[in-house]
Amino acid sequence: MKESLSLHVPTYKELGYRQKIMQDPDTMSYNKGYDLNFDGYDKSTGCISFPKHEWADWYTYFIGQEPRRFYAYIVRESDGKFIGEVNVHMNADAGWYEMGIVLEAKYRSKGYAVAALRLLLQHAFEKMGAEAVHNEFEEERSAAVQTHLSAGFTRHRKENGILELLITREQYFRQKSILIMTSAISKILADNQPSIYLYGSSVLNDFRLGWSDIDILVLTQKRISQPQAQELVILRQKLLENEADNAYYRSFEGGMLTLSAFLSKESDCVVYWGTSGQRITNTYQFDSFCMTELLQNGKLLYGLDVRSQLKLPKYADLYRDVKKHYESIRKYAQTTERTFYSFGWLLDIARGIYTLRNGTVTSKTSAAQWVLNNNLCPVPVALETALKVRRNPLAYRNDSDILNYTETLGPEIQRFADVLEEELDSIIR
């Protein structure tokens, strides 16, 4: 069982701990070798002096200054020991908070860093109203990179070997909901040895609130019982009862079944969550797109990773499913409804073309941008508009001009589908 941590704003008398870790070469080794132009920095060790005569000014600047800045010690609750420090401060020009975390050397590699970083993010987003939190450091610091990614950050950009990582307010609350959902599912299935996966737009950094789903797959070693299935099938609604304003629980979709049934496609006790509802059924299968996403980009949320028992789809499988999408587009998208989801047909076509050309799967947004960059779309204005709406759907959900346009997309979708048809035919030839 992981030890619990908490954050503690130090009293003035407790600043000796900060002085101690700032002067510890093992703790500060990550900081050595730089040309930093400020008093008290030791380039050879990375240590920074923190003499007592500086404490009063430092304390006035950092403590009690929310929401501009926040500083705290990391506390191990089992014995009350301080094990490091965290801080955030506002960067008004960038519109985000910069952050820092230092874990005392002797407490590293014990699983504390991710937990401490999550506590800092919780404070920043839930107490300080942060819109985003940012950090940057050398990409070669692989342990630090993984700590940030595990806590929910995404790669923002890279320049001259410096990696910038960012987590937005939306990402934080979505990931918090994912953690709560994962915990709830794992408790219900505690005796079934579940492996819980996240795949799709959330792991491809393409989730957009108001449009996207949160795709999960739960594979168990032991068959799900009827009482468990009854509890799972209404779990989204039960969580919403306790958190009515949560914007994410209703977005969860996927299937829960035994690994053996998922592999064999045999009948099983299956819990299915979809856009239009939920049910207990007897089968659940992936198409080649979902399987490729799961195997190449999926994230294990809980349990043992069993993906080595799954097979990566071949090009022929991807071709078959692209063709199925194409046939649906010809059948169902001759005319379109007054909803921005009608833009999804254009994104589906773009992803199909990308997949046929590249032999793999990417996010719909990335595929559409790739198609535009390669001048493969005969109706670029339509696809550009689809991308604009996809990237910020909540801003356009009540836009009458956009909604009126969605009713007229049929001919443009079919013109774009002509390109997909040519791609399919060229591969046959």
Task: State where each predicted segment sits.
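GNAT-family acyltransferases
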Residues: 1-105, 154-173
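Conserved NTP/Mg2+-binding pocket subregion across the NTase superfamily
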Residues: 229-339, 343, 352
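Helical scaffold of the NTase/Pol beta-like nucleotidyltransferase catalytic core
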Residues: 174-197, 227-230, 429
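Catalytic metal-binding acidic patch
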Residues: 196-236, 251-256
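Nucleotidyltransferase catalytic cores
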Residues: 300, 304-429
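Conserved beta-strand-loop-alpha-helix junction that forms the acyl-donor binding cleft
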Residues: 104, 135-145
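Conserved GNAT acetyl-CoA-binding A-motif
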Residues: 126-136
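Conserved acetyl-CoA-binding loop-helix of GNAT-fold acetyltransferases
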Residues: 109-123, 145-150
